UniProtKB/Swiss-Prot annotation:
It comes from the Bacteria. It catalyses: tRNA(n+1) + phosphate = tRNA(n) + a ribonucleoside 5'-diphosphate. This is Ribonuclease PH. Coiled coil: none annotated. The lineage of its organism: Bacteria, Bacillati, Cyanobacteriota, Cyanophyceae, Nostocales. InterPro entries: ExoRNase_PH_dom1 (IPR001247), ExoRNase_PH_dom2 (IPR015847), ExoRNase_PH_dom2_sf (IPR036345), PNPase/RNase_PH_dom_sf (IPR027408), Ribosomal_Su5_D2-typ_SF (IPR020568), RNase_PH (IPR050080), RNase_PH_bac-type (IPR002381), RNase_PH_CS (IPR018336). One of its GO terms (biological process) is rRNA catabolic process. PANTHER family: EXOSOME COMPLEX COMPONENT, EXOSOME COMPLEX COMPONENT RRP41. Phosphate binds at R87, G125, T126, R127. Keywords: Nucleotidyltransferase, RNA-binding, rRNA processing, Transferase, tRNA processing, tRNA-binding. Disulfide bonds: none annotated.
Amino acid sequence: MVWQRPDGRKPYELRPINFHTKFTRFAPGSVLTICGETKVLCTVSVAESVPKFLTGSGKGWLTAEYRMLPSATQQRHERELLKLSGRTQEIQRLIGRSLRAALDFEALGERTLTVDADVLQADAGTRTAAITGGFVALAEAISQLLQRGVLERSPLCGQIAAVSVGLLEQEAYLDLNYIEDVAATVDFNVVMNKNLGIIEVQGTAEEGSFSRTQLNQLLDCAETGIQQLLIAQQQAITDWDRLFVGK
């Protein structure tokens, strides 16, 4: 039996992806990331200080926070006020780890970049959309810092994107929506850089197990999607050639 995708996409086809840059007024970097029906607002703020463990090192830092609006899902959920759920903590750590791989912290200097990812509407893939859109917002923020003379050179030495993949009817599918995410027997979140090096892989079998061959199929599927996302990011960042200093 072959899985029929609810939106008619092919197995290795992404949902439509759009980055609306300069979406808010005050944050140096802000992007509304739309991935199908998933919508995540990514902003980047700058503080002229670093955590205590970096004070005097000459190096900067990047951290991330992730939240969902109560009405982002079909059934309203309570706001996380006094204590974050384990899921929220895991996701914001993933976002931070992933985007730190894009930066030269010596070039950033002793300042902290905070990436805020706020899910406005969730149809699965919120963490991968937050990483992919968060990178665009990060580039926008760095562009602003260079224009203002805060930075002498760009610290953007890497490019990062992320996508979900899963097994449905024993076959690999790219960029799962909510219906597919629930039905998948195996699902992965894959983060890669510009050279398709793996930054992080989160994966689990919901039912039974999966083979090494299927694992390779899932990674190949993710690689196909990330190549497209990397291009979309570059097209959304107006001064990409000036900002990116990596290889």
